[in-house]
UniProtKB/Swiss-Prot annotation:
Top-rank EC class of the record's enzyme: transferase
Record's protein name: Bifunctional protein PyrR
Ribosomal protein listed as a keyword: no
Encoding gene per record: pyrR
EC number in record: 2.4.2.9
Organism: Roseiflexus sp. (strain RS-1)
GO molecular function: uracil phosphoribosyltransferase activity
Family indicated by similarity: Belongs to the purine/pyrimidine phosphoribosyltransferase family. PyrR subfamily.
Keywords (A to Z) from UniProt: Glycosyltransferase, Transcription, Transcription regulation, Transferase
Catalytic reaction(s) noted: UMP + diphosphate = 5-phospho-alpha-D-ribose 1-diphosphate + uracil
Lineage of producing organism: Bacteria, Bacillati, Chloroflexota, Chloroflexia, Chloroflexales
């Protein structure tokens, strides 16, 4: 099982800055924009995007954290006792543009669960999606509005995102081969 680094800390910083510029441009500013990071690695990415938006627009954008554990369609498959974490959305999402943030977009099932969970908290005017990595292989008709990097992968590869807020150490994104190849 090998891994290959595809983004380092500087690449991630540049991607976040670009995503922040795109969010501000697409929404003609950030007056009614809020960010909601999907728990685990989407949450620190949302905080970083918010910091970049504040630097660009001189406006503090509200940030929340969404736990989707009980909304997943693979709940029974993943194990007997899922660990549920707190959702923290300390603002009203109704009438706002909410940008959902996650680290990797793959099948679309995590985002479907996040949409279900998010709408339990109100009725946003619109929901947009920002991801650091889009790796393809969609199973649902979901696409990201803002993408740090498109990384085509095979089904026997996965993307490992490491963020210092969650994992310690240095930021990076890696392609990890999950099965041995015959050769």
């Amino acid at each position: 099982m090998g891994e290959k680094q595809i983004l380092d800390a500087d690449d991630i910083r540049r991607a976040i800055t670009r995503i922040a510029h795109e969010i501000a441009e697409r929404n003609a500013g950030v007056r009614d924009v809020a960010l909601v990071g999907i728990r685990r690695r989407g949450a620190p990415l949302a905080m970083r995007i918010a910091a970049a938006l504040e630097e660009i627009e001189r406006v503090r954008v509200p940030v929340g954290v969404l736990d989707i554990t009980l909304y997943r369609d693979d709940l029974g498959i993943r194990g007997p006792a899922p660990v549920v974490h707190a959702t923290d959305i300390p603002f009203d999402i109704s009438g706002r543009t909410v940008v959902l943030v996650d680290d990797v977009l793959y099948t679309g099932r995590t985002i479907r669960a996040a949409l279900d969970a998010l709408t339990d908290f109100g009725r946003p005017a619109r929901i947009q999606l920002a991801v650091l990595i889009d790796r393809g292989h969609r199973e649902l008709p979901i696409r990201a509005d803002f993408v740090g990097k498109n990384v085509p992968t095979s089904r026997d590869e996965r993307i490992a995102t490491r963020l210092h807020e969650v994992d310690g150490g240095v930021d990076g994104v890696f392609i990890v081969r999950t099965t041995a190849t015959s050769g």
